[in-house]
């Protein structure tokens, strides 16, 4: 199939999707607020739950889409169709800020625009709803240091390194691990010289960069499986999954090799499987955002904007949370009050949120 045919098909499918109501009646005369995510994932089911709650409370009609593929060219026709249909406001998790800023700037001149989870700061958006991903990445780095205090070998896994969070999260992890003497120092692995990478403090990063999967969960499992083959026999291993589906994908590969407990796993986001696995001890911990609140706040802000109320705009980053099996007391870290809930308690919260959208 030619590239032009594929693009045309994407546009046709997207146009068909956006013509269907996500909730409510398209002829109701209500304000229409549209939300598009960067892919399909339980993380975004939580976002949808929050968005629906805000839509009810603010008396607006909600259009909510989770694209099947993490690609800007899939997202664009959905947004364009919404603009053409006259929606009142749009929230988007930006996939490629550099590549999408020009198009989003045009959108922002026509309707109020909010970015969430992933930012495009030069797009003219009203505000960003999300955590400081570099700070959240540093929290992941602190988990790694707690698990492997004497150093070790690490591998990072993520969907994309073109998105804002795909760049900031790994950067935060590595900044936390680095020392003045070893901040990306190129080296060969001391036990496996065929493995090249970089040292960040006492931690050897295999290949010196994150392994990406383009949002494809099957590829995420394959990446983890391939890495296990390459580091076979290396002690003090920690695999870090930085998108919501990465920790379960890593765990699937680790279980297949009967290496649970031998390969430590640290995650990002609140995938239900990740939370269950922290409670069971198969995953060490995860740093979570608040996708429910992302959806809620995005809709609340846009509904207020349409009605001339600018007071709901957010001026700073949201606080992340650190989830472990045993939890811990709240801490003040870099100006944010950070909570450390037990996995079993946080899982209950997530389960209740998902029930509200029938998941």
Q: Can you name each region flagged by the protein language model?
A:
Residues 3, 23-359:
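A residue-level marker of the well-folded mature domains of exported/periplasmic proteins
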Residues 1-9:
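Bacterial N-terminal signal peptides that target proteins for export
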Residues 18-22:
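C-terminal motif of bacterial Sec signal peptides marking the signal peptidase cleavage site
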Residues 12-15:
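Repetitive helical segments and hydrophobic/amphipathic motifs
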